[in-house]
């Protein structure tokens, strides 16, 4: 089956924004203009197509990145048909993992900002993730029809807050109630959309007289940004020659692909204005799969790569798992190279297992179409893969490659869940395992002491939604305990020559293991490291991994309060063995004993997770908000005007003090302040806190 759309006309894009910037509405309009949706779904009716989980429609926030395929020929049908694979990503900080994993499989992104709120905290997180994966992006400033809308302020904030390099390619005509269209700076014409056709039709007109000088000023900046692409373009521009529209677009495109500039557009998705021009910009300025660097991976430990071509061996990345009530597990994957057909056997190179792809479906939000095959650049979902988890590679059986893995953060909050009835008990195990498979930032374990099931995640909302899904999708009723903080233990000083000896010799085959270690702090975030510094064979080679294993088995249970031990370096320096009685288990026990003793002597302490908290509040509540953060042991690190007459406060606060903060903040500011928080790092807990934590564990 030949390709319908050449790969050069593919655009794999993400639509990414802060909560309430109107991202889902923007995506809905895209689906409407590209002819997929006949009736526009409004978020505030709870009817948006991309938000298809029940909870999303109730809460009006997007939780899972739905992937949708659609086509666009341009506002004036001026392009050959292009194929857009759109991933709608959540804007809530508890779901940052979803943003991260969609950034990994995209080629370009549209950042949606609110013309009133501008660049908000979550926008910064998303921007950092886009930088990490070097994703070229354009920005769309939405809600131009709202009170207080200001396009140029948003442009300025992209520069100052995100350290981006924004280049507007349109400017708005009017704002708030008077917003009526945009001036296209490439054509130097006004674009006015027809309201009766919900913006399906438009006409070009002259630029309003009062906007001519503004439009000329911004056009000049845009042309200069395009000319900076090369010395010859710059010479032409400085020599006073006029650059053609094609040359300007080519210059802007090349610089956008290199992530040197971010073209900016504006509009009001709700009022059906501006989204159409933004779709044209996706074609003009964002890359096709062949214009981004070849995907890197490794084969047998050697670096390898795959180019976006149907002729290369098949390779794909599974970036999301979803459970579907009718067909079971859907595995969303992005094809980087080659072709795969339904019924083919592929290799999961991470696990070294072969699997058969049953059926392949392409999603339109929650609607699916079965297709025969997918090719390089496609995004689709497979039915029938059993073993695959998020972030793993699927590839041709005879051309093995492991694509770069995604990094998933460790959870910072735990709660205990208990099934309400015996019947719920078994179902809960199945449900939790399935949810954990879908979402790598969600973990499930059983507490050895209490026998309780503990679930961990990225925030209160994250866990709340998962418990909710357990009830809706799996029919499991559960009682949820109070949230617990994920404390850690570490050491503060170095100790040397600490020995652990495990000896049992009372006739017959005995046990003998003897290890001497140095224990030192390895620095924040460095994790556990083990170095073998044995000289002269005082411990035989085959027993050294056993010492390491014994220590690793002990790491999960610190000596102060049983929390996991992090950021320690162990050097195995000396020891002894017995020809007959030494065994692997004896050296595991020796390693464990040495480590426990060394921990006791090395100034053990408790670490607590610190959160980066950002509060936006009207000025009159600033004193109350700051006082409250101080009471929560927060350290205020800076204050800013938020550009709307309010203040933006940045602070670092221990997670333990942040439970229930949203309720307290709402009542202290009559619901007018908002906040976001994300995990920053672990830091040593003050003495009184550590003592309280240890007392609670006894």
Curated annotation (Swiss-Prot):
CDD domains: EF-G (cd01886), EFG_III (cd16262), EFG_mtEFG1_IV (cd01434), EFG_mtEFG_C (cd03713), EFG_mtEFG_II (cd04088). GTP binds at residues 17-24, 88-92, 142-145. SMART domains: EFG_C (SM00838), EFG_IV (SM00889). Keywords: Cytoplasm, Elongation factor, GTP-binding, Nucleotide-binding, Protein biosynthesis. GO terms for biological process: ribosome disassembly. GO terms for molecular function: GTP binding; GTPase activity; guanosine tetraphosphate binding; translation elongation factor activity. It is found in: Cytoplasm. Pfam families: EFG_C, EFG_III, EFG_IV, GTP_EFTU, GTP_EFTU_D2. Its main location: cytoplasm. It comes from the Bacteria. Residues 8-290 form the tr-type G domain. One of its GO terms (cellular component) is cytoplasm. PANTHER family: RIBOSOME-RELEASING FACTOR 2, MITOCHONDRIAL, TRANSLATION ELONGATION FACTOR G-RELATED. Catalyzes the GTP-dependent ribosomal translocation step during translation elongation. During this step, the ribosome changes from the pre-translocational (PRE) to the post-translocational (POST) state as the newly formed A-site-bound peptidyl-tRNA and P-site-bound deacylated tRNA move to the P and E sites, respectively. Catalyzes the coordinated movement of the two tRNA molecules, the mRNA and conformational changes in the ribosome. Belongs to the TRAFAC class translation factor GTPase superfamily. Classic translation factor GTPase family. EF-G/EF-2 subfamily. This is Elongation factor G. It comes from Chromobacterium violaceum (strain ATCC 12472 / DSM 30191 / JCM 1249 / CCUG 213 / NBRC 12614 / NCIMB 9131 / NCTC 9757 / MK).
